[in-house]
């Protein structure tokens, strides 16, 4: 685990070179939450209702915007308003995976207009470094209106059974991330990647943020190969933010479930940094 994982969120916010990462840690510290809820619902009404009800207890809401049957300006305006109201960030789990020219258009234009409302996006590096270069180029262009309010997570590992995102692919994810520190926030991975072999030397003060998916208190997996872990095990392996979907939104009482994940995630974080 990276030595940065032993620092508090507030300490990392003060020293982090990436402005969006600083904002992310500030939100976590202010709300005492490292929870990302994966709101995998299929209508704008359901999405905005969940965001409003769960907003006080989460640091980030993660969307799969292309599963909405009625995406519109109402979706964008509603998400942005609720992010302001409840002080959370929006992560669109688009998993960009195409040539650079295509992903630039998917991100900043296109039907979903992702750059307008998603603070955080993610991508696979299967297409090579060009995908990250292209997204960074778009976000850092002089005429890009959102500037430092946008950032990228590289999908370095997955929690599904039989995932091929391992070994040299994960190492390449670290290599590429180190070339774009002003845009790449960190990784979606099952652990801290500080010890992964890399051909790129780490920069002084390097502090990649780790989001870990598949966190569930009531299940160990599903019939489609998803493998779950607890907040304690995820944070113990280096996660800075835990992602839970069905464990929260499909619970009998999603608000109470969100509170439970918030409490357990925060207690696991305090144990990791040695706080009382």
UniProtKB/Swiss-Prot annotation:
Q: Name one GO cellular component term.
A: cytosol
Provide the residue positions that the database annotates as binding substrate: 40, 62-64, 93-102, 228, 246
The keyword Lyase belongs to this UniProt entry's keyword annotation: yes
- The reply to whether Isomerase figures as a keyword in the UniProt entry is no
Tell me what reaction this enzyme catalyses.
orotidine 5'-phosphate + H(+) = UMP + CO2
In this protein, the active site sits at 95 (proton donor)
Pfam family for this entry, one: OMPdecase
Its EC number(s): 4.1.1.23
Q: In which pathway does it act?
A: Pyrimidine metabolism; UMP biosynthesis via de novo pathway; UMP from orotate: step 2/2
Keywords, sorted A to Z: Decarboxylase, Lyase, Pyrimidine biosynthesis
One Gene Ontology term from the biological process aspect of the record = 'de novo' UMP biosynthetic process
The domain of life for this entry's organism is Eukaryota
Single Gene Ontology MF annotation: orotidine-5'-phosphate decarboxylase activity
Q: What family is it from?
A: Belongs to the OMP decarboxylase family.
Protein name as catalogued? Orotidine 5'-phosphate decarboxylase
């Amino acid at each position: 685990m990276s030595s940065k994982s032993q620092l508090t969120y507030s300490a990392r916010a003060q020293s982090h070179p990436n402005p969006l990462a600083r904002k992310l840690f500030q939100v976590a510290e202010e709300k005492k939450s490292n929870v990302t809820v994966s709101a995998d619902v299929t209508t704008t009404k359901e999405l905005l209702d969940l965001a409003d009800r769960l907003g006080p207890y989460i640091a980030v809401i993660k969307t799969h915007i292309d599963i909405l049957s009625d995406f519109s300006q109402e979706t964008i305006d509603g998400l942005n308003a609720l992010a302001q109201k409840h002080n959370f960030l929006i992560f669109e789990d688009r998993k960009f995976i195409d040539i650079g020219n295509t992903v630039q258009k998917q991100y900043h234009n296109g039907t979903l207009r992702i750059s307008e409302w998603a603070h955080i996006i993610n991508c696979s590096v299967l297409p090579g470094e060009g995908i990250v270069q292209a997204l960074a180029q778009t976000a850092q262009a002089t005429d890009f209106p959102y500037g430092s309010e946008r950032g990228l997570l590289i999908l370095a590992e997955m929690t599904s059974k039989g995932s091929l995102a391992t070994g040299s692919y994960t190492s390449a994810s670290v290599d590429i991330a180190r070339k774009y520190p002003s845009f790449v926030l960190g990784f979606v991975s099952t652990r801290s990647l500080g010890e992964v072999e890399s051909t790129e030397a780490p920069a002084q003060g390097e502090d990649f943020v780790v989001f870990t998916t598949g966190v569930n208190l009531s299940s160990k997996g599903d019939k489609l190969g998803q493998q779950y872990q607890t907040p304690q095990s995820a944070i113990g392996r280096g996660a800075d933010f835990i992602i839970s979907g069905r464990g929260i939104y499909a619970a009998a009482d999603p608000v109470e479930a969100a509170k439970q994940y918030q409490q357990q995630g925060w207690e696991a974080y305090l144990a990791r940094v040695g706080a009382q």
